Amino acid sequence: MPQHDQLHRYLFENFAVRGELVTVSETLQQILDNHNYPQPVKTVLAELLVATSLLTATLKFAGDITVQLQGDGPLSLAVINGNNQQQMRGVARVQGDIPDNADLKTLVGNGYLVITITPEEGERYQGVVGLEGDTLAACLEDYFLRSEQLPTRLFIRTGDVDGKPAAGGMLLQVMPAQNAQAEDFDHLAMLTETIKSEELLTLPANDVLWRLYHEEEVTLYDPQNVEFKCTCSRERCAGALKTLPDEEVDSILAEEGEIDMHCDYCGNHYLFNAMDIAEIRNNASPADPQVH
């Protein structure tokens, strides 16, 4: 059995092409545990999680990537946020009924894919592409074609392992400033496309690479762990409250007695009473009662 929740990078010795392989199980489960999503939405979040992990691994700097689907369908929003340390979180918003056999276009409707790259230092970049492909992988390949100009292929698989949801994926990309032959890249993509869900989700990474590329010379690097981690905090909530008009905050306090800030990603609640709000307005740091 493979070690899930790990990302592996690999290089082809004889081609200017690099690859990534990721499998997720526990990270996915933690994202899904906080909500009661229909199965098709769980599948979309699993695919988004895999895609975001693969994309963050392409970053050459410290920062994060947010990959989100938005549309006018019953799945109005699905988003995964991850950073270069492979710390992930995600959430979806569902409006209306979703049939069990709903595909991506049925779920999202008329929509688009938004990819936001936020370096810790430097300018933020955002790319938007319409959902013209039938799969998330196809839409992401369209994004790469339009933005990076680097030939890129993604292969995403979802399923169950020991009764728990799992997902995996592989990314192939021509190395920047390298002259990879188109036929070489296409050859490697054809090999990678043969990967089955069962193989990707149940075999160790080196076995997967052997099955796909046993006639090629491939270097597999040490893996990087993938984990669920939310970036919410009481301080961030206090900062958000500080931006609201005093009248609006006071009205909620008068009606409710306290303000309950809820994080959609992890389910944490942060409670603020009148004394906390007074401290926030005085630029003090309020006490830290946090409800899970």
UniProtKB/Swiss-Prot annotation:
Mod. after translation: Under oxidizing conditions two disulfide bonds are formed involving the reactive cysteines. Under reducing conditions zinc is bound to the reactive cysteines and the protein is inactive.
Record localization: Cytoplasm
Disulphides: 230-232, 263-266
Keyword Disulfide bond: yes
Major subcellular site: cytoplasm
GO biological process, one term: protein refolding
GO molecular function, one term: protein folding chaperone
Zinc is among the record's keywords: yes
CC per GO annotation: cytoplasm
SUPFAM superfamilies given in the database record: Hsp33 domain, HSP33 redox switch-like
InterPro entries, per the entry: Heat_shock_Hsp33, Heat_shock_Hsp33_C, Heat_shock_Hsp33_N, Hsp33_helix_hairpin_bin_dom_sf
Protein keywords: Chaperone, Cytoplasm, Disulfide bond, Redox-active center, Zinc
Similarity-based family: Belongs to the HSP33 family.
HAMAP family from the UniProt entry: HslO (MF_00117)
Described purpose of this protein according to its UniProt entry: Redox regulated molecular chaperone. Protects both thermally unfolding and oxidatively damaged proteins from irreversible aggregation. Plays an important role in the bacterial defense system toward oxidative stress.
The name this protein goes by in its record: 33 kDa chaperonin
Species of origin: Salmonella typhimurium (strain LT2 / SGSC1412 / ATCC 700720)
